[in-house]
Amino acid sequence: MSLYRSLVFVHVLSILVLLLCHGAAFTVTYVLRQERRPERIGVLLDLSLASFDSRRALGRIFWIDLLVVVGSGIGLMIAGGWWRSWWPWLSVAVFIAIVLAMRELGGGPLSQLRRSIGLPWIAGGFGKPDWKEPEAPSQKAMESALSRLNPTSLSIIGVGGFAVLLWLMMFKPF
């Protein structure tokens, strides 16, 4: 088996692991829109956070796997001689756009929701977030955070973005 095919295998497998890590968070965003009980919201938020919290085993797997996705992608660009083509650079830009959009539209409202119900919350950061102490719960802040959460937009960005990435990787249009 060639180095290139081995890297393709690692890259695709690591993307599948990355998507698997998002399963609970994906479901939670839909369930949260219907929930108004702070204690249940807290449990759902903890479930969602488990996939990304670098203090937990699954969160560490997620962040290490993200490095494998990026590293194998760079390796494929070099091993395949694709770094001179446009499609891999567009793939990088699309991937970064997906990450930033998900952080803004998913991570931001979820962190504000944690804050609004009196849980420790994240002020920012990737991988090593800046955790803040719990504040007094606020029904108004909770409703505001829930109204900002749009699971349909997150789904469109995630599925649509990865469809674009898949198209670029499979068809290498330019």
Predicted regions and their residues:
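Polytopic transmembrane helical bundles with strong interfacial aromatic enrichment
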Residues: M1-F174
